[in-house]
Amino acid sequence: MILYHGSNVIVEQPKLIRQNRYLDFGFGFYTTTNRDQAVNFAQKVTDRRKTGAATLNIYSVEEAVAFKECSLLRFDSPDEAWLDFVAENRQGTYQGKQHDLIYGAVANDDVYRTITLYMTGVLDKEQTLAALKSRKLFNQLVFATEKSLQYLHFEGRELV
C-alpha cells in the first residue's frame, strides 16, 4: 500500500510528536492513500507555518503484515462508532483501548464543521450521520505507536 503525508518538510523518519491540539484519531503520525488530500494538506500547512516548502512524503507499508502484527482499529464507514471515536478524540476525552494503527474516514474542514455542530448539541447523532452520508470522505491511516512506525517505509518525496 502506498501512503502519503503532506507537510512543509521532508519526513524520512516519522516520529510520534505530542501536539497541542486534538485530532480525529488522537495522537499519531497521519497518512492517507489519497495523494490529492496529502498535497492539499502540504500546501495548507506550509501556508499556515510560513516556512519550508509544500512536500508530499511518500511511504509504503505491507498492509497484510502490519494489520496482522499490530493492533488495528478500522472504521469502514463514518458510522456511529466512528463518530463517537472522533468526537471523543477531538474533545480530548477518549479513554478507550489504545491501538497501534487506526484506519477510517478523515474529518476534513467541511466534515469537522458538522462534527462540531454535533459536539455542541446543535445536531443529534442521527442528523450528524445523515449529513455525513452526503459528504465525500477521504481516508486516513494513523500510526499511533512506535511499534507501528516500524512497518512504514519512506519511498521518497515530491515538492508540490
Pin down the residues of each PLM region:
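Glycine-rich loop/turn
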Residues: 1-29, 37, 43-47, 81-83
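Conserved NAD+-utilizing ADP-ribose enzyme module
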Residues: 23-24, 40, 44-160
